[in-house]
Regions:
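Short, structured motif recognition centered on aromatic/hydrophobic residues
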Residues: 40
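Short N-terminal segments immediately surrounding and downstream of signal-peptide cleavage
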Residues: 22-37
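Alpha-helix boundary/capping residues
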Residues: 11, 44-47
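Amphipathic N-proximal alpha-helical interface segments
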Residues: 21-24, 47-117, 123-191
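Sec/Tat signal peptide C-region and signal peptidase I cleavage site
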Residues: 16-20
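Sec-dependent N-terminal signal peptides
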Residues: 4-15
Length: 191
């Protein structure tokens, strides 16, 4: 029941009163692209949980947290590591569907259709593939692409049992709000 309620809240928070064409109009747990992370937690809290990127070409740092969330089981936020204002560059929300990929994909489809019905002129790109970090795991992605190249990714991740046990991961649904500038930076860093 908690997951059903979470999906309904998720859908409602992704909707906007008018047909939006700006990715900054979308929120995850009340947080939007362009907000300062300092509006949601102290600098000390950020420094305790921040993660530096392993790839030196990546300028964005990340936090993941699970405290005081209403809709998601976890939230991830990225910002430029040199930005002292911690302006949010991208964010994602995670809902766990461990060993329940059928319901994960069902909710993914519901969210995708709801967003498509709420926002016109989005291009849908669906992909399925093997996870790079888990050769026996899979991903199922619906990317909703704005005319300017911004993306809302709705992804189901299905990890193998050995990978789950080793890394303490669970299968999950992840909704990511990804501006084109952020996506371009990652694409360039991994060339």
């Amino acid at each position: 029941m908690k997951k059903l309620l979470a999906i309904l809240v998720l859908i409602l928070t992704l909707q906007t009163p008018s047909l939006a064409d700006d990715i900054r109009d979308f929120q995850i747990e009340g947080i939007s692209i362009g907000d300062s992370l300092l509006d949601y937690m102290s600098e000390e809290e950020i420094k305790e949980i921040q993660r530096k990127p392993a790839n030196k070409k990546i300028k964005y740092w990340r936090i993941s947290y699970r405290k005081n969330l209403k809709t998601y089981d976890a939230v991830q936020i990225w910002w430029d590591g040199k930005d002292k204002n911690y302006k949010i560059a991208s964010l994602g929300g995670i809902i766990e569907f461990d060993n329940d990929m059928n319901n994960c994909k069902k909710k993914q489809n519901e969210i995708t259709i709801d967003i498509q019905n709420s926002i016109k002129n989005l291009r849908l790109n669906k992909q399925t593939g093997q996870l790079s970090q888990d050769k026996d795991g899979n991903f199922y992605q619906s990317a909703l692409i704005f005319e300017n190249g911004d993306i809302i990714n709705i992804q189901c991740y299905e990890f193998s049992k050995p990978y789950k046990n080793k890394h303490n991961y669970v299968d999950n649904l992840k909704v990511m709000i990804v501006p084109k500038k952020f996506d371009d930076h990652y694409q360039e860093a991994y060339k």
